[in-house]
């Protein structure tokens, strides 16, 4: 395998796209197609839920190295090179790439993340769950600078941190739009439907990310990811609400300076930067327009109504496999909400219940199996909590969000 460390000096970068049919994956392929002098697709991987899109991508890119995680979907797709249970991981291990973009959804991305790091390729990481769940294992496997974040907030922090040295950093500030329920009361949230939770005010994302943003669980995952990526203690990471989603994050330095990264909400900017890091791709996104009056608002997060971020902070500070427990409990609870089995507030309530009983997992994992065991336990515990939850406030499943 080849590690890409010198930008574009040696020719086009070979990119392996995992999660190619999702929101991040499709936008990444658009970035690559718009910059054929910089990037070349060498492989695609998908879960298997959108075979028509994958077929179109195969035709457009001419790629033959393709993996589908779901065996049944792989059989329906026909001539697919990798379709075993470990298809995506094998694709990463056997395909020469300079950059592996991991945009898979959920904990499915952990083994491919570790395989990408072992290959020496740069890992453009959009699958935050693999870092949150794998934590110490992922950090141990990574070379310095090998992981480049795709999330807009972490991309912003990486850019802002260029303005100073590590010992000059006072704190990191993550921004959150506040989601579609910003300003709502806890009582109001009892009546939220999956359709309402699937409408983000500023970003266009996949269904699970959109729901996680509505519950603020996504910001909790990003808090954990921030600590792991940049090595900053949790007490030096703040979360503020910024409904316009123009300032994507900020870094405050010891002299009182605060450096912010601002751009209109468009994931193609952090995607392009992660693919070409540390060089920028011209024309990746629109500029901010300062020719007209506008207001950028910042306000504190209401932790009482939206406790997901503080639960994530607790899980991260406790350490061990607790962040994996947080993530797995959320995945179960989110699925239950979309199926109409629990109310919207019960998503975070389920996470809290599982974390409260998870003291046994406050031990660092020795291997991937330890992480998977913690997640399996968390899912089972979450399922029990969901079964006990009151159906009051639960709503019908909305097609297209589950």
Swiss-Prot record:
Protein residues bound to NADPH: 21-24, 47, 50, 127, 129, 206
GO biological process per UniProt: isopentenyl diphosphate biosynthetic process, methylerythritol 4-phosphate pathway involved in terpenoid biosynthetic process
Catalytic reaction equation(s): 2-C-methyl-D-erythritol 4-phosphate + NADP(+) = 1-deoxy-D-xylulose 5-phosphate + NADPH + H(+)
Name of the protein this chain belongs to: 1-deoxy-D-xylulose 5-phosphate reductoisomerase
PANTHER family: 1-DEOXY-D-XYLULOSE 5-PHOSPHATE REDUCTOISOMERASE (PTHR30525), 1-DEOXY-D-XYLULOSE 5-PHOSPHATE REDUCTOISOMERASE, CHLOROPLASTIC (PTHR30525:SF0)
Family matches, as Pfam families: DXP_redisom_C, DXP_reductoisom, DXPR_C
Positions of 1-deoxy-D-xylulose 5-phosphate binding: 128, 152-153, 177, 200, 213, 218-219, 222
Keyword annotations of the record: Isoprene biosynthesis, Manganese, Metal-binding, NADP, Oxidoreductase
Keyword Oxidoreductase: yes
Organism per entry: Mycobacterium ulcerans (strain Agy99)
Binding site for Mn(2+): 151, 153, 222
Gene Ontology terms, MF aspect: 1-deoxy-D-xylulose-5-phosphate reductoisomerase activity; manganese ion binding; NADPH binding
Pathway(s) where this gene product acts: Isoprenoid biosynthesis; isopentenyl diphosphate biosynthesis via DXP pathway; isopentenyl diphosphate from 1-deoxy-D-xylulose 5-phosphate: step 1/6
Family stated for the protein in its record: Belongs to the DXR family.
EC number(s) stated in the UniProt entry for this protein: 1.1.1.267
Protein task: Catalyzes the NADPH-dependent rearrangement and reduction of 1-deoxy-D-xylulose-5-phosphate (DXP) to 2-C-methyl-D-erythritol 4-phosphate (MEP).
CC cofactor: Mg(2+); Mn(2+)
Gene: dxr
Broad EC category: oxidoreductase
InterPro entries: DXP_reductoisomerase, DXP_reductoisomerase_C, DXP_reductoisomerase_N, DXPR_C, DXPR_C_sf, NAD(P)-bd_dom_sf
Disulfide pattern: none
